[in-house]
Amino acid sequence: MKARILFAILVAGVSILLARVPPAQPHRIGPADIYPDPVRTPGAANPQINQENIGDNICNPQWSTKQIRPPAEYTSRLKRKQLREYGDTVHQTRAELINPSTGKVDTTRCVAHSDNMACYEEDHLIPLEDGGNPTDPKNLWPEAYNTRVGGTIMGAHQKDVVEGFIHDEICYDIPGAKKNSYIPATISITLKRGQQILAGDWYACYESIRKGEPCK
């Protein structure tokens, strides 16, 4: 009887331990601070968009992300909450972000882990234009503008380049599809594959684009 009790305790302990182990972080070629935490923000797809209907929504020139974009009140509230959760708590006033030459906010003045909301875009990891979920917190995170790779800014604006390029690869085979990228797509990928690239390693795709290669 004692042996059975000890075995049950052991099994329960192992189960609790396994439940606390976060999923393994996917291999990514860039530094960790340009990506969201894969546990908090793994990405989430829009259940209303699938491979069969992309011609009616994301690839349709008449369709716009404005139709499904969440209100600013929601994303601002979530951004404030997630900044705390992500540990972005280094105090920085708006005055510290002002460029004296222009009198405007200059995000290159943002320090690492700044608590100033102007230093971030509350971004969809899988973008709306690529079938991402509009409101699921697992698909949203405060993406910094001023993160760098080898001294080069690599943040929210650079990810925007990838988002449009992936969109055009997803829509490559759709007749009359809208174009979101100034860089022409050369191959067709599935909606699912495009979302995997964006959630997995958008920066690897950015490097491929920079070399004149497709993301696949």
Question: Positions of the model-derived regions?
Answer:
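Nuclease and nuclease-like effector domains acting on nucleic acids or nucleotide cofactors
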Residues: 3-121, 128-216
